[in-house]
């Protein structure tokens, strides 16, 4: 896909829930969405406590507004640790189930080429990553809602159960440069190896699965 990096001279919208979310038309995002049981509550609370202490010590009221130096430290200290918690394999890990993973993949690919362009993506046992470029005037939040809502319906139906499947708030990061894009591509492609997985994952690019193990 044609990559357009974040442009600081172009209007940017930042909204915040528990995490900051940057939005700018025409850019690419690194998205991580996790299952509701993927991080135990006590570990999630500890992560948030340490993050809030760091923000207070750095006199930062909003992590969406950081200097470049502080942003790099923030991602080292908290973004990386957040992903380490996911890779620890907590929870039921239903996406290691071939049928459940396939239903999520179908939802990821449903809008590819129309509502958005998918670059590299990876289905892990309790979360997934994707590099995605929304089409013009298609909000990223709407894309993620379709992914989560559709796959939740399909997977719950397959497993014959009800209830929340996904954690409410996803993690997304606006890609700022070609170098960062390549970094995220490598991270996604290597995530199964980093997590020590030999089965139960799928790595793809666009509409094609590049590496499938255990499915």
Short names for language-model regions:
Residues 1-215:
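Short catalytic/metal-binding and nucleic-acid-binding patches
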């Amino acid at each position: 896909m044609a990559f357009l990096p974040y442009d600081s001279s172009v209007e940017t919208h930042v909204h915040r829930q528990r995490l900051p979310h940057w939005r700018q038309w025409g850019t690419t995002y690194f998205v991580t969405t996790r299952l509701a049981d993927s991080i135990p509550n006590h570990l999630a609370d500890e992560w948030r406590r340490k993050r809030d202490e760091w923000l207070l010590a750095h006199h930062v009221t909003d992590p969406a507004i950081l200097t470049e130096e502080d942003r790099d430290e923030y991602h080292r200290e908290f973004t990386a640790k957040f992903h380490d918690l996911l890779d620890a394999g907590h929870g039921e890990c239903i996406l290691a189930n071939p049928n459940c993973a396939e239903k999520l993949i179908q939802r990821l690919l449903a809008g590819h080429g129309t509502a958005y362009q998918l670059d590299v993506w990876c289905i892990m046992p309790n979360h997934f990553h994707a590099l995605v470029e929304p089409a013009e005037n298609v909000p990223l939040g709407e894309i993620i809602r379709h992914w989560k809502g559709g796959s939740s319906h399909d997977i719950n139906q397959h497993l014959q159960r009800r209830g929340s499947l996904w954690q409410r708030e996803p993690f997304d990061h606006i890609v700022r440069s070609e170098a960062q894009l390549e970094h995220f591509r490598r991270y996604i492609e290597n995530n199964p190896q980093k997590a020590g997985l030999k089965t139960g994952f799928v790595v793809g690019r666009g509409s094609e699965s590049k590496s499938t193990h255990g499915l």
